[in-house]
Amino acid sequence: MNQTVKVKKKKKTITLGVVHIRASFNNTIVTFTDIQGNTISSASAGGNGFKGARKATPYAAQVTVDRASEKAKEYGLKTISIRIGGPGAQRESAMRALFGQNFVVTSILDVSSIAHNGVRPPKRRRV
């Protein structure tokens, strides 16, 4: 009689990590990584059931941060550094949601890319 034994994989404990928040005009993406950049958990507003213009709301960003941080806390993450980028209006509410998750925040860094007269903008919208 052959029996298979399931071996439960041991989760790594990571105490220090980086939170990458990308707040675009259309969506919010939150990624928790370790110091080397390996992804621990990630979530997006679209993946949390928000569709269309509701993905770009501050409430959607708050829910996204809550979902991603729940997964990251399973790894024992306690101390984070925040890297926030993008032009979206959800930046502030995403950071407030992170402060409410009882993480120790060591630094906040704005990594938004600033165009120095780079590419041509899209044509004006006609309604």
Swiss-Prot record:
GO cellular component terms listed in the entry, alphabetical order: ribonucleoprotein complex; ribosome
Cysteines joined through disulfide linkages: none
Claim: rRNA-binding is one of the keywords in the record: yes
Superkingdom, taxonomy of origin: Bacteria
GO MF term list: rRNA binding; structural constituent of ribosome
UniProt record, GO biological process: translation
Assigned keywords, A-Z: Ribonucleoprotein, Ribosomal protein, RNA-binding, rRNA-binding
Function: Located on the platform of the 30S subunit, it bridges several disparate RNA helices of the 16S rRNA. Forms part of the Shine-Dalgarno cleft in the 70S ribosome.
Subunit record text: Part of the 30S ribosomal subunit. Interacts with proteins S7 and S18. Binds to IF-3.
Protein family: Belongs to the universal ribosomal protein uS11 family.
Protein name: Small ribosomal subunit protein uS11
